[in-house]
Design a protein with these regions (language model features):
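N-terminal amphipathic, basic-rich helices that act as targeting or association modules
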Residues: 1-8, 67-91
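Condensing-enzyme catalytic core mediating Claisen C-C bond formation in acyl metabolism
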Residues: 2-10, 17-36, 41-45, 202-276
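Conserved catalytic cysteine-centered active-site region
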Residues: 32-76, 102-111, 117-158, 190-217, ...
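Short, well-ordered amphipathic alpha-helical segments that serve as non-catalytic structural scaffolds
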Residues: 76-87, 126-129, 257-272, 294
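Active-site-proximal alpha-helical scaffold in enzymes
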Residues: 79-83, 136, 143-177, 216-233
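Phosphate/pyrophosphate-binding loops at sites that engage ATP/ADP/AMP, CoA/4′-phosphopantetheine
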Residues: 82-95, 135, 231-236, 264-276, ...
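Beta-strand segments within the central parallel beta-sheet cores of soluble alpha/beta enzyme folds
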Residues: 96-99, 142-146, 168-176, 236-242, ...
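Acyl-CoA/ACP chain-elongation machinery
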Residues: 167-207, 213-214, 242-256, 279-289
Length: 302
């Protein structure tokens, strides 16, 4: 069965979908100095650069005053993103939701006040999908995944699998991650995964595959996709293949030989040939090398 992507929405440090597309196609960068907290308060916050998304729930009438007070901001982002997905004509009993909060839930518990910290919405990561179910009356399967950097694409793959198995006809799938928080920078800083060499020139900090790369730039945002078994006049693309595996290696670094990455890409591409490769491209010395080596050994470098 072919699964189609019929709609999408996103929030990035550029802004919404239109602003993001404009920024990317004009070769702009959307990260800069950290403004959401003082990075000088901790010796572990060596990286001073971030891709921040600034959100005002009042700009989205779909989010009620009660929800603004009650829900973690990441959940509000998801509701706002879902409001930009066209659900007209869909059978709501056959429409599911797989949306995940990334690490937002844990960070929002840390920054919430005592009253909100006792709120179940801050403790149950699946509530982010459940809130979309309730808001739009979608009674199909509801779930979430949490797999670090691959959380969003995992959600999309599981959504496609659910459609192929006949469990649902449509799925809203994706992830949001509200990560600009002191503890995120402390923990990533301890792992030495963040760029620290370009604090004074933040526009140069993220440089995947560059010989001067020194780490990633922590950023935040989210994206949702509408997957369906039905092709429409608004269909954006179709899913021709996917694969999932893992290195069984280090927590924050791929195996340097890239063999497992190569196997995953080979499995995903068995029925298709790509015209564009969207790499992970973390701008870390080990990660970029292993990924590029795997691509080259697959013969996809051209």
């Amino acid at each position: 069965m072919t699964v189609y992507i019929n709609d999408l929405s996103c929030f990035t440090p550029f802004g919404d979908l239109q602003e993001t597309w404009k920024g990317v196609t004009n070769n702009k960068v959307a990260y800069g100095p950290i403004t959401k907290f003082d990075p000088n308060e901790s010796r572990w916050t060596r990286s001073k650069v971030a891709g921040e998304f600034h959100f005002d729930a009042k700009e989205y009438p779909i989010i009620t005053e009660s929800e603004r007070d009650r829900l973690p901001e990441s959940n509000q982002w998801a509701l706002a993103l879902a409001s930009q997905i066209n659900l007209d004509g869909l059978d709501k009993s056959r429409t599911g939701v797989i949306v995940s909060p990334g690490f937002s839930m844990y960070l929002e518990i840390l920054q919430s006040n005592k009253e909100n910290a006792d709120n179940i919405y801050h403790y149950c990561p699946d509530m982010i999908a459940h809130n979309i179910n309730m808001k739009y009356g979608l009674t199909g399967a509801s779930a979430m995944t949490l797999t670090a950097c691959s959380t969003g694409i995992y959600s999309v793959i599981w959504a496609a699998m659910m459609i192929e198995m006949g469990m649902v006809d449509n799925v809203i799938a994706g992830s949001v991650d509200k990560t600009i928080h002191p503890d995120a920078f402390k923990q990533m800083g301890k792992l030495r995964a963040l760029s620290t060499k370009y604090n004074d020139t933040p526009e140069k900090a993220s440089r995947p595959y560059d010989t001067q790369r020194d780490g990633l730039v922590l950023s935040e945002g989210g994206a949702l996709f509408l997957l369906s078994k039905h092709k429409t006049d608004n269909t954006i693309c179709e899913i021709d293949g996917y694969a999932i595996n893992n290195d069984a290696y280090q927590t924050v670094a791929p195996h340097p030989d890239g063999k497992v990455v190569q196997e995953c890409m080979k499995d995903a591409l068995k029925d298709t040939t790509p015209s564009l490769i969207n790499v992970h491209g973390t701008s870390t010395p080990m990660g970029d090398y292993a990924e590029l080596d795997a691509i080259n050994r697959l013969g996809l470098k051209d």
